[in-house]
Amino acid sequence: MKNPSELKDLLSELEEKGGGYFVDFVTTKGIQAGIMRLHPCEIDAQEPHSADEVYYVIEGNGFINLNYKNHPIKQGTSIFVQAGSEHRFHGNTRDLLIFYALGK
C-alpha cells in the first residue's frame, strides 16, 4: 500500500493487472478502499458484502441496480449500500470510475 496514493498510479496498476476492474489502495483490519473502473458493456460481478459500503462516482455515468431498483448515477454521485444488499453498476456508455470504501 502506497500512502498517499495517486489516481494515475492506481489506474496504471489496474492496467497491469490485466483483467481486474478494481484495485484496493487501503486494506486494514477495519477498512477496505479503492477504485473500480468499468468499461462500457463490462460486467460488474460483485456479490453483496458483509459490511456497509460507500461509493463515489469520480467520472462517467450509468446506473446502479440497488436491491433490484435502477438508479441513475453520474460524476459526483455518492451511494450508500447497506451490508448484504444486492447491487451492480451497469449501463455506462463510457468508462465509469468509482471510489469505494467498506468496513471489514
What are these regions (language model features)?
Residues 1-35, 45:
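A short, N-terminal "cap"/entry segment at the start of jelly-roll beta-barrel domains
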Residues 29-31, 42, 77, 85:
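Surface-exposed loop/turn positions
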Residues 30, 40-51, 104:
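Short beta-strand/loop turn elements enriched in aromatics
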Residues 31, 50, 69, 85, ...:
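A generic "binding-loop/recognition-motif" signal
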Residues 38, 49-64:
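Short, conserved beta-strand element in jelly-roll/cupin
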Residues 45, 54, 68-71:
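Short, surface-exposed secondary-structure edge patches
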Residues 68-83:
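Short acidic-glycine-tyrosine-enriched beta hairpin
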Residues 83-104:
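Ligand-binding loop in jelly-roll beta-barrel domains
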